[in-house]
Regions:
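N-terminal non-cleavable signal-anchor helices
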Residues: 11-14, 449
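C-terminal motif of bacterial Sec signal peptides marking the signal peptidase cleavage site
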Residues: 15-19
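Acidic/polar surface patches and capping/hinge elements
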Residues: 21-451
Length: 451
C-alpha cells in the first residue's frame, strides 16, 4: 500500500511538472508560418477556380489584416487605417492581456482567408492543426491571441463588406453583340461568358477611381492590311507560326508557358470537357514575393509588409485593368485569325474568357514589380520556382522589372494579345504601382533589402 502511495505521488508530481512546462512554453511564430498559410490560400484558389481579379481580392484582405495587427505594435511601421479607402483603426487590446501579436496576426489571416473562399474546410483543417499545437504549448496566451485575432478579422471583414463585391454578384452578365466586328467574342474550347464585367465597380484601396490610370485606346479596329491594327494582328500570327515551327527549342514558347497562369484552361476529350489547375497571375507574383522575402531573410513584420503592399497594388491593378477591358471590349486575335487569316490556327496558350485590351498580366506584373522594387531594390536577382508545382522549370531574373517585362511579352508569344495591349498594359501597371508606392506610408524610413 505504501509503495502504491509513493508511486501515485510520483505520477502526480510528474504530471504537474509536465503540465506546467506545457502551459508556459512560448509560442514562436516565424515567417514560414505566413508563407505556409498563403500557400494554402493559393492551393484553395486553384481548387475553387477563382478568376484572377477575385483571387487578387482574396490575397489582399488577409494580408492587410495580419499586417495591421503587427504594424500598430511596431514603431517602425505605420497602420494602413486612413491610407486605404474606408479603413478605420483596428480594435485596441487591453494592456493587461498576454497577447502574442504575431500569433494573433496569423489567426486573423486564416480567418479572413476562410471568409473569402468556397472550400472553407481546407483552411479550417489547416488552422485546427495549428490551434492544437499552440493550445498545448500555452493555452492562456493562445486563447487571448486567438480571440484578438478574430476580433480584428471581424473588423476587417466589416470594412471588406463595403467594397461592392457582393453587389456585383447579382449584376447582369456581359452581352455579346456579334454584329460589331471589333467586340470581344467567346473563344474555344469552352466559349465561356466574359469574366467579371463589373469589376471596375469594386472599391479600390488606393485609387480615387477605377479609371484613374485609364490607358490610351487600342489602335483603331481595321482589317485593312496597311492599318496599324491589322499589322499587330498579323504579327501575332507570324510569331506564333515561327515559334511553333521551332518547337521545343523555342525560348518564346518556354516563356509563354511559364507565365500562362490561366485558371480557366479547359481540356476536351471526346464529349467531355474538364479544367486543368493553374495558378493565377496574382498568385505567381505572390509566389515571387515569398521567394524574395526568404532570400532577404525578412522577419515576420517585414514579410507581411511585402505581402500586404504587393497584394494591395495587384488588387487595384486588376480593377484598373478590368475597367479598360470592358470599355474597349476588343476582340481577341484567335477570333480574327480564324475568321480572316487561317481557320485552323490555334494560339499556343488557351485564350482566357474576357476582352483583349489591355493585358492583365502586363498591368498586374507592372504594378507588382514596382512595389517589390520599392522594398527589395532595383537589382534584386532571384530564381523563380513558383511554377515547379505545375510541371514547369525554374526561370532566373536579374530584377522584378525584368520579370514583369517577360510576363508581359509572354502574352504575345502565347498568341492571346496584340503588341499594344502588352506595351500599354505594362506602362499602365508601372504607373499604378509607382502611385501605390508613393501613396502608402507603411514604413517610417526607407530600408531596401540587399541582394
Amino acid at each position: 500500500m505504501k509503495t502504491a502511495y509513493h508511486f501515485l505521488i510520483v505520477v502526480l508530481i510528474t504530471a504537474c511538472i509536465t503540465s506546467c512546462a506545457t502551459k508556459d512554453e512560448p509560442i514562436v511564430i516565424t515567417p514560414e508560418h505566413f508563407h505556409n498559410a498563403i500557400d494554402k490560400v493559393t492551393e484553395v484558389i486553384i481548387h475553387d477556380i477563382f478568376s484572377p481579379p477575385v483571387a487578387s481580392r482574396i490575397y489582399a484582405y488577409p494580408n492587410i489584416a495580419a499586417y495591421e495587427i503587427l504594424a500598430v505594435n511596431d514603431t517602425e511601421f505605420n497602420s494602413l487605417a486612413g491610407q486605404l479607402a474606408g479603413l478605420k483603426s483596428i480594435p485596441t487590446p487591453s494592456k493587461e492581456t498576454s497577447i502574442n501579436f504575431e500569433l494573433a496576426a496569423l489567426v486573423a489571416h486564416m480567418e479572413m482567408s476562410k471568409r473569402l473562399i468556397f472550400s472553407e474546410q481546407e483552411i479550417e483543417t489547416y488552422r485546427d492543426s495549428l490551434y492544437t499545437t499552440w493550445k498545448e504549448r500555452n493555452e492562456d496566451v493562445f486563447v487571448q491571441s486567438r480571440d484578438y485575432g478574430l476580433e480584428v478579422a471581424g473588423h476587417i471583414a466589416q470594412w471588406m463588406d463595403g467594397d461592392n463585391y457582393k453587389q456585383t454578384r447579382t449584376m447582369p452578365k456581359f452581352s455579346v453583340y456579334a454584329d460589331e466586328p471589333s467586340r470581344w467574342q467567346p473563344t474555344p474550347p469552352a466559349y465561356m461568358d466574359g469574366i467579371e464585367p463589373h469589376w471596375n465597380k469594386i472599391r479600390p484601396f488606393t485609387l480615387t477611381s477605377s479609371n484613374q490610370f485609364k490607358p490610351v485606346p487600342p489602335p483603331p479596329f481595321s482589317l485593312e492590311e496597311d492599318s496599324d491594327f491589322y499589322k499587330e494582328l498579323k504579327e501575332v500570327y507570324d510569331i506564333s507560326k515561327q515559334i511553333t515551327k521551332d518547337g521545343d527549342t523555342s525560348e518564346e514558347i518556354a516563356i509563354a508557358q511559364f507565365w500562362d497562369c490561366n485558371p480557366y484552361v479547359s481540356v476536351t476529350r471526346g464529349h467531355l470537357m474538364f479544367a486543368t489547375k493553374k495558378i493565377t497571375p496574382g498568385g505567381h507574383w505572390i509566389g515571387i514575393t515569398k521567394i524574395a522575402s526568404k532570400k532577404a531573410g525578412f522577419d515576420v513584420i517585414n514579410t507581411l509588409h511585402a505581402y500586404a503592399k504587393t497584394s494591395i497594388a495587384m488588387n487595384d491593378a486588376f480593377i484598373s485593368c478590368w475597367d479598360e477591358k470592358y470599355r474597349s471590349n476588343l476582340i481577341r486575335p484567335e477570333t480574327l485569325i480564324n475568321n480572316h487569316i487561317d481557320d485552323s490556327w490555334k494560339p499556343i496558350l488557351q485564350t482566357p474568357p474576357f476582352p483583349e485590351y489591355v493585358s492583365g498580366h502586363s498591368v498586374v506584373s507592372g504594378a507588382a514589380s514596382e512595389t517589390l522594387t520599392s522594398i527589395f531594390g532595383d537589382d534584386f536577382s532571384f530564381d523563380d520556382d513558383t511554377e515547379i508545382a505545375y510541371g514547369l522549370p525554374v526561370r532566373s531574373f536579374t530584377s522584378f522589372k525584368a520579370a514583369a517585362e517577360e510576363a508581359a511579352v509572354s502574352r504575345m508569344y502565347g498568341g492571346i494579345h496584340y503588341r499594344a495591349a502588352v506595351a500599354v498594359g505594362l506602362d499602365q501597371g508601372q504607373k499604378l504601382g509607382k502611385f501605390v508606392v508613393s501613396a502608402l506610408e507603411m514604413k517610417n524610413e526607407t530600408m531596401v533589402a540587399t541582394n
